[in-house]
Regions:
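Short, amphipathic alpha-helical interaction segments positioned at domain boundaries
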Residues: 283-312
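Generic non-transmembrane alpha-helical segments
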Residues: 56, 131, 261-264, 268
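Short amphipathic alpha-helical interaction segments
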Residues: 250-266
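Minor-groove-contacting beta-hairpin "wing" of winged helix-turn-helix DNA-binding domains
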Residues: 277-281
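A generic structural signal for well-ordered alpha-helical surface patches
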Residues: 230, 241, 260-263, 289
Length: 312
């Protein structure tokens, strides 16, 4: 929810509808940063929404933060983290800002000179990780943190953590019905995406059609690679025998190319390779996305340069 448009009455209404989890968009509490991104959202406004959620019985509250925003630096973001810790959300997502003005018109108002450089962004990220993990949050991986008592942390310790388009989850193999512009549904081995444009989305609904304009059905290789990638992202460890038995392959033969790509990670002690398993080391957890990407065949075959999920 957006605290700027969600008052206490709306929070109560959402809970009465049966919702029990809430994610708050914050980005940054610094006034200068908020002005630079045209999102004025005072701390007290977010605090009021969180208090209303607690009072109405929401079981879990997540807070989304973004680093790499204009006017942001280590000092300003440290204060934002202080305020986040004061509010004590159950989960925190710390995303990297992707500056893509050619794709997103509102970003064209942002001056490149106002953006922190790569070194500053990396320092902001590491500062935040240190502060959060020192204050009772577990680094789940892939930008996400949760309190040690949260079910995400418990699931990761037990090896039952899952991941979907919305992030990490404790619900294994659940289908996901997505509503809204550009959202993606997952049903079994099938994926379906809604239109990007609001006009196209509502036109389909008015005409009584499904608001879906494209889809994809996974093949056997896709399903195997999805399992490998998700296991690495969720557990930081992959047992070769589990893959062999589940998909009827010999891991070292099927993934010989990918294992070769692990050599630089092993050299820098980010990954540990054993005869029976692959393990992402403690200091390699921050790079788990990069490790998992090597098992994505489509990404390897693609010539496009990515820009959405880089670390810095």
């Amino acid at each position: 929810v957006d605290p700027r448009t969600c008052d206490a009455d709306k929070v109560k209404h959402l809970h009465d509808l049966g919702l029990n989890r809430m994610s708050l968009g914050v980005q940054d509490f610094n006034p200068d940063v908020q002005k630079a991104v045209n999102r004025i959202q005072p701390f007290e406004m977010t605090k009021a929404t969180m208090e209303a959620a607690r009072e109405n019985g929401f079981e879990s509250i997540n807070m989304d933060l973004i680093y790499g925003l204009p006017k942001q630096n280590r000092g300003t973001f440290e204060k934002t983290i202080d305020q986040v810790l004061e509010l004590s959300p159950d989960r925190i997502a710390l995303y990297h800002y992707a500056h893509l003005p050619n794709h997103f018109k509102p970003q064209r108002r942002i001056l490149p000179a106002d953006l922190p450089d790569t070194v500053e962004k990396v320092n902001i990220m590491f500062d935040a990780i240190k502060r959060l993990t020192a204050n009772g949050y577990r680094y789940i991986g892939m930008d996400h943190f949760a309190k040690e008592t949260d079910e995400l942390s418990v699931a990761q310790k037990e090896g039952s953590l899952q991941r979907n388009f919305q992030g990490y989850s404790t619900k294994a193999e659940c289908d996901m019905i997505a509503l809204g512009v550009s959202s993606i549904s997952k049903i079994g081995s099938a994926y379906a995406c809604n239109p990007r444009e609001l006009e196209d989305y509502y036109a389909a609904i008015r005409e009584g059609r499904l608001a879906t304009n494209r889809g994809y059905l996974l093949n056997a290789d896709d399903e195997m690679r999805r399992y490998v990638i998700m296991t690495i992202m969720c557990n930081f460890e992959l047992r070769k025998r589990d893959v062999d038995e589940r998909f009827g392959i010999k891991f070292d033969e099927t993934f010989a190319y990918e294992l070769g790509k692990m050599k630089p990670y092993v050299k820098h002690e980010l990954v540990e390779l054993y005869d029976d398993r692959l393990v992402v080391s403690a200091k390699g957890k921050i790079f788990v996305r990069a490790v998992a990407m090597h098992f994505d065949r489509y990404l390897r075959e693609s010539t496009r340069a990515g820009g959405y999920s880089r670390i810095a």
